[in-house]
């Protein structure tokens, strides 16, 4: 039974848990909390557990919990409203701890402060997220707390902050801020503060008019904090505004203003005084916001005078924050001067009442504007009182200061001034408000700067939002807003005005919210095209989005605007994020609706194609083309007539944009089927000769004009504009000059133009065609590298009709141009890249035309591609040229990889056109197994080298070759294995070494590919890039260990094959340091990984081959990395118990007399290690003496000393020192003899160190 009861106990526990849950659900707060935690504060459970731990312990036990809570709250910095439902649950218990601990503060001040500081950090984090107004609602506010809070502030004030960095904050600053906020609530107690201050009871000297000690303490602390640069300055100003505006604080109020007068009158120019000024201004602003008019009227003239003087001082000129506070205080002084009233003349847009609508008949249910009714209050006695209102004389000065604030250079000052204009105007009469409006409109004069326009827009928006801008003023305001929407002033290499356009869009947004449909109908008709122009064509994304938001607001609030919903769905927040998408997609879609096409065209024509930004001009010209289809006649008769004269403008921006735009429009007209008149075609044909005649390619802007002219020629060629023979020659000469230009962009644009020009005008003219080809063939060997680059590209785009006459010469010349130039001064990687691309294009052009002719059985072209082109491209894979830009040969290799792919398809397609009966020796040999092996091997080599991009390119090309859907590539050795390693999957990460190398090393098993794979692999293993070296080495070692795990014979087979491949590399790349250095480093790493140390028969032949290579490679070498790797290899071989170790040991001893001290030292280390591991090198009785000489000699000393020690070692080792010397002579003495001038070995050594990068 007992066991049965124990089995039942979990059920009992579940029942008890359910009862607890039901009890919790009865609690209204907990229920709301569970609902909110799913939708608002996602981390509430964690926060709650941390808070419960703090509350239960009465302090923060784990300091990391504070950091966790603060990190969570920081995530809600921009959405504080999500945290507000939890504030009471967080703040109340924490403040209860602070209050309870403060009671014992005098007894244990330091200990209590250490408890309060971390709690204050949490509360202050909530203040920064939710704002102080939301947080202080849950602060305790009993009368007795006032003295406790002042005591706590006194203790905190006497503690200096350890650090100002937030990450290192220990809570001093947060504790002061929280205490000041707590006092801002407590000083509002509805009793005389002197009656709360217990210290007065024992003070018999305290008089009736004296200030309570508590008040004096608070005032003293606040004055100190007003000099602070932290948040205490702002909070102390808030506290002062609450304290000094109490009815019983008249004397404190007067004394504080006397102190502020002294501060504002101080001329001291120091950092402390600057922050004191900011604090005083902030405190005065808070006081003028809180205090009653009656209290402030007495001090108002003095404060205004101080503000006027200070606004003209150097301190204000230097500090935008000070100017902001001056403007804020000025507007509040103005509000104090005027009685608070809601002006009867104000415009009010009132939403129709649902209950009223329900009570009316269905015929009268809807107002004319459907939802909003404008209310202008009728004239009454109140209006007469408004007009008779006495306006203080100082108000004019205040408004003038606010208007000057609208011209300020800083946005924060202008924004504060705009709000001040709105607030002050709301208390003025209708006549005076019109005067204010007139003054604001004066800010939009042409002579004003961008700051004035921006401030004016902000002020207009504020007036509109408050209903202070009446509809009768729209005729004056709307034209100004339209100008502001297009405000863009050029200043040097840039322009200003984006903030003005953004503010103008804000004004339009405010209009939509403030006014009824019937008042806004005509205004919206005027503003809509301009808003959409800004939304579609503005350079800045924030302006485009602001204009689109303003249009959306107006459409949503102003009723049925034509096509409004459709346009809003097109021009949304995301579609406008891309400038290209805005120009080419959004604008084109909007232009289809009535009323937008012509404004859009005019904007592009008059403002955008002459824009200072080159990319924007190009985009504007491109954007004109898709608009042509809506009104071709307008573009042909009007737009082109405007553009043609502009192509010769003295303004570079204008002529560049006009040339581009003219070409794009002509091409778009052609695509629409619109035929230009003969006169228009003649004028278009004369643009380029006119530019030539005006010599507009020279001087500033010549390069971008060449780009524009090339694009223009391409467009008119595609449009088949009628050209005279002389004009054709001029255009061709122009493009030839552009092809010679060193700028690659100009060359590429010229190549595109040549392709279309030749296709449209030179096909069929044999003489011109041959001359053109011969000229470019000659240019392929021109000393000027830019000429070679351009001609190679030009030959690649010529049509079949031109290529067929000289096809063999062209192919052979381009093959020759792909090879590395013999003269180092003539070498140019870009020329070879272009030659490879041109050669590939020529082959494609020639074969495509011939493939479409079934009667053409001539295989000479295809055989030439196989023998010459493929061989040239395979050799281009070995282009490892390097200059000051790095591995520029990689550009050639990448182009060759793509070229090989295309030529492979050409040959395989040709083979597929023949049936089995039609095969002959020539046909079957177009693509044989030998060529396939060379092709795949070359690709695989690129797939395991050090360039990430090239590895990815090679792997993807191999994938396409293996899995091409329409072309089958035959005779690929081990195709199944290749398909296993390179699966037909997209998005494989071939550029990631950890992914690609483990796959490619498996190909070392295949003897037909292993040499190429290994020759690329050693480059990666011995390279400088650490991550690449590690990934490639791990892949190789895992491959070798995998064989060992399977079968020892498999391991030996793999080692033997690997050794053969390495020996092949050593012979193939003899004296080529690019390969030899990493190859030697790879051998060293393999030896260190216990590979090739198993003393099988093949390993000894491997040792012999490596040593033969080392004898050649280390001879007269000055490469420290190479020498060090070679010595390490000799050391490993010398450690093997075989007769070959004696030879390696002898070579190591020869390096003990090397002229470089570091090499002698490295050789000595290897000799020492070899002796420890191989006992046959020296007899046992001599071993101790040899070890002693090696370890105790200074091998970095002078060479004569080291030679003596080496001689002694040779005698002890039983080696004929003359043989060793002869070996050394054969290795390095020749180099020493050839450099007798280098008498100082340290000088030579320093050069070695410099060249080695140490």
From Swiss-Prot:
GO MF terms held by the record: beta-tubulin binding; GTPase activator activity; tubulin binding
Pfam families attached to this UniProt entry: ARM_TBCD, TFCD_C
GO biological process, one term: microtubule-based process
UniProt xrefs under InterPro entries: ARM-like, ARM-type_fold, TBCD, Tubulin_specific_chaperoneD_C
Knockout consequences: Embryo lethality. Embryo development limited to the formation of a few giant cells lacking microtubules but not actin filaments, each with one to several nuclei. Failure to localize KNOLLE in mitotic cells. Presence of abnormal endosperm with giant polyploid nuclei.
Keyword Lyase included in the entry's annotation: no
Disulphide linkage map: none
CC per GO annotation: plasmodesma
The keyword DNA damage is assigned to this record: no
Superkingdom to which the source organism belongs: Eukaryota
UniProt keyword list: Chaperone
Oligomer and partners: Supercomplex made of cofactors A to E. Cofactors A and D function by capturing and stabilizing tubulin in a quasi-native conformation. Cofactor E binds to the cofactor D-tubulin complex; interaction with cofactor C then causes the release of tubulin polypeptides that are committed to the native state.
Function: Regulates microtubule function in seed development. Required for development of both embryo and endosperm tissue. Not essential for cell viability. Probably involved in the binding of beta-tubulin in the multimeric supercomplex.
UniProt family annotation: Belongs to the TBCD family.
Other observations noted: Belongs to the PILZ group of genes that disrupt, when mutated, the microtubule cytoskeleton and produce mushroom-shaped ('pilz' in German) embryos.
Record PANTHER family: BETA-TUBULIN COFACTOR D, TUBULIN-SPECIFIC CHAPERONE D
Name assigned to this protein: Tubulin-folding cofactor D
